[in-house]
Regions:
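Secondary-structure transition motif
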Residues: 1-198
Length: 198
């Protein structure tokens, strides 16, 4: 079936957006997920879509649209993490030694910091400056789906190591650890971001 004029316009819009100059944006990862990225086990991340007020979600034609419930018009919703080709610089738990060198909890989970750092404590990933970043990722693909649509292969791409369908259960445990108890049951719409190290 041919693409409608409206959807063709949206398709052209996202194609044009993908040709914009490459941008870099920060993204937070937990210590366990940083280790999975460094080990080459994690090449995907799922992030909850936060709809605008009075908007609902529609997915089609491999693009993501939102419907304004007031005027019933579809508009393209930009992924806040960027487009394929854009880069994500990873924020992780970190600190700074008295020498000025940055160190990372993913590398030293049990290290006693008091005698070796300026602050004497690990600092949250949200406070990491760009200068401290050591992991840069390039987005290779973005799609939208319900959380429960994740496949076993995708769960392994998320860094889970259990074989077969068990990987989905492992990912559910990981999701609730990050997003809170019962968050899996909500089955939200999520951005599925596939990436590779730069």
């Amino acid at each position: 079936m041919p693409m409608s004029a409206t959807k063709a316009h949206h398709h052209d819009t996202i194609e044009a957006a993908a040709r914009k100059p490459i941008k870099e944006r920060p993204i937070l990862f937990s210590t366990d997920m940083v280790r999975a990225i460094l080990a080459g086990h994690k090449t995907q991340t799922r992030r909850i879509i936060k709809p605008r007020n009075n908007y609902s979600i529609f997915v089609g034609w491999d693009d993501e649209f939102v419907l304004n419930d007031e005027n019933k018009e579809w508009t393209l919703s930009e992924c806040p993490y960027g487009y394929p080709g854009d880069r994500l610089w990873v924020r992780e738990t970190w600190t700074k030694q008295l020498s000025g060198k940055y160190i990372y909890r993913a590398d030293h989970p049990d290290w006693e910091l008091a005698d070796y750092t300026a602050t004497g404590a690990w600092r949250p990933s949200i406070h990491m400056p760009r200068a401290a970043c050591r992991i840069l990722l390039q987005i290779t693909h973005i799609r939208v789906e319900r959380l429960h649509d994740i496949s076993a292969d995708d769960a392994r791409a998320e860094g889970c190591t259990d074989p077969g369908p068990i990987a989905i259960g492992e990912y559910q445990t990981l999701w609730e650890k990050i997003n809170g108890p019962e968050s899996w049951a909500l089955n939200p719409w999520v951005w599925v971001i596939t990436f590779k190290p730069v």
